[in-house]
Amino acid sequence: MKEKEDYFYLLIFSLMIFLDRIAKIYAHGCNFLFCIVHSKNYGAAFGILQNATLFLIIAAAILLPVILFFFLKAKSKLLKIALTLIAAGTVGNLIDRLFYKYVMDIISINFLSFNHFNIADLSNTVGAILLVIFLVKSKK
């Protein structure tokens, strides 16, 4: 892999974790689109697996080396970006689980009745969408 590409993926990974941490610490307020809230999530995305902190920590600890394995074997930039975003989101939420025993969800979209989420969740979601796009394109 090219050294410049390595730095690009490392930058994306680091930036997503940094933005997640900063937003959770400093962000607050509302505008017409969304509110910044501080909500404790003891489960996973969409409110599933409530009070399964240990399971989610173990799952993340297993998932991260698997992501790294596939990242190192990947030839596609789309796949590498998808895996980078998923890894960053996983680490962002893992940090919360390790330090607080819950994930701090901070974003609430005003016009949707939807669970609160955070930047790590957004990173995971975009990464998962890109992964699906990659898988669909690679089947053709």
Feature locations, PLM:
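Alpha-helical transmembrane bundles and membrane-interface segments of multipass inner-membrane proteins
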Residues: 1-140
